[in-house]
């Protein structure tokens, strides 16, 4: 079970999945440390610590390889993942940004977020955005397009320009947040 970040809505069910299915849980050290903060989990039980992801670390799943990237900001240990997806046998580079939300405080964390966006913008060849919440990345709109997809039409999730545009939107929102955070000082 790869955990993008240790907020309750992403890790709240991890212990149950561990108990019921024997799942191994992986996240960054910073976010494993967050599991010691009971307020984060509300009524959810703390997961058993298994694997720790590092920036540039990889995990092979059969012939597929996941590459991990630390992209802090949303939490100090946000884990983003790059991997290959396929459409009719054709490979496409996909990235899941593990923490796109701006629901945190402080200049330092906002700068972490800005640096993470800059890092993600530097990745070459990203064609598919796999958002970690359904309300970003136009997931439902893309699913509707997929249901109506004609034979030989481009897969609606294969959208390099959409990835770039989404990151630009996140960057603009984070820059506005930084101005607000600096004004609080």
Give the label of every model feature segment.
Residues 16-17, 119, 177:
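Short alpha-helical scaffold segments that flank and stabilize functional sites
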Residues 161-185:
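C-terminal regulatory/interaction regions
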Residues 35-36, 40, 59-64, 68-69, ...:
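Electropositive, surface-exposed helix/loop patches at the edges of structured domains
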Residues 1-58, 159-163:
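Active-site HxH/HxHxD metal-binding segment of metal-dependent hydrolases
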Residues 28, 37, 45, 140, ...:
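Solvent-exposed, non-transmembrane amphipathic alpha-helical segments
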Residues 58-60, 65-165:
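Metallo-beta-lactamase
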């Amino acid at each position: 079970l790869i955990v993008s970040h240790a907020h309750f809505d992403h890790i709240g069910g991890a212990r149950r999945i561990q108990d019921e299915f024997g799942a191994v849980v992986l996240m960054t050290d910073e976010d494993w440390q967050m599991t010691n903060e009971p307020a984060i989990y509300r009524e959810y039980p703390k997961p058993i610590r298994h694997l720790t992801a590092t920036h540039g670390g990889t995990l092979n799943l059969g012939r597929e390889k996941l590459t991990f990237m630390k992209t802090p900001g949303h939490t100090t240990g946000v884990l983003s993942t790059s991997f290959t997806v396929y459409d009719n046998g054709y490979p496409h580079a996909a990235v899941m940004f593990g923490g796109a939300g701006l629901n945190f405080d402080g200049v330092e964390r906002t700068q972490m977020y800005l640096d993470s966006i800059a890092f993600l913008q530097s990745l070459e060849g990203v064609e598919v955005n796999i958002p970690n919440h359904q309300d970003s990345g136009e997931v439902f709109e893309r699913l509707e397009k997929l249901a109506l997809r004609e034979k030989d039409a481009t897969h609606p999730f294969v959208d390099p320009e959409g990835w770039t545009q989404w990151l630009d939107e996140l960057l603009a929102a984070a820059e506005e947040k930084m101005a607000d955070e600096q004004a609080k000082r």
